[in-house]
């Protein structure tokens, strides 16, 4: 199929409508078959559960054109499983895993012309989401729901190379103990908006959230997990019940251990030990890894030996290996790549 006439090198990380999106409705205790539609508009009750009580969750993933010309997605089964966890915590009906993956395949295939070519640095971003759609005036779960998937082409997250960012230790809390920090709920991101805009106004790129209970342990940022590298090249990621289980982070730990032969640790990371790490990065779907060069704790600077000019050597190897797997340049572990075409 001929690609759309898009300057792939100039598009940013924003919304560009594509031709088709998937829609399924839940009513009377069951999901319908779902359809692909050209209509990008959502029509719901003014009293819909999503509008009144934020009953919504979502996922984020990408489709790629590989080196040999295939269109693929990366570990969509894990997105389905994570969305299942989100739905259960928010008292929403689960959209079955097999149907989730099939709907992703249908949607990407229907928008094949928008999948950027190999080597462009761009990808097709995929956004599955679900929300309570019928009227709810009392505080309770909705009775009807809609599951949708739209896609949009996005440019390379880093134009001109990945430059290390500066983040601050945030005075606000992202998630409460035993709360919803471990799921991908819209309400978590709404709560982070003031904090991230405040960080930007103060000249910082991102926030480092500490645990709400003791404010001594590293959790995550508003939209990415932390990854640290020790001075003896051990890869360490924070572990907490309040952290979203990043699929990128899980994959990077496998890459570190099985592809690079590095020791890995998932454990509680105390803020006091951050100054002793050699490298720091933020990992997620959008950028894979964003290198962190400096953390500012109320005026006190922690500068990583990797510096402010480029990724640290281990972070760079992790990034290059995982993106190589996603783009088909490196053999993937079994089950990681879902071929669409």
Language model: regions and residue ranges:
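Charged, gly/pro-rich active-site loop segments
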Residues: 97-99, 107-121
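Helix-start/capping segments and mature chain N-termini
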Residues: 1-107, 136-341
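Intrinsically disordered, low-complexity linker/loop segments enriched in Gly/Pro
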Residues: 110, 132-133
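Extended, Lys/Arg-enriched charged tracts that mediate electrostatic binding to polyanionic substrates
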Residues: 117-131
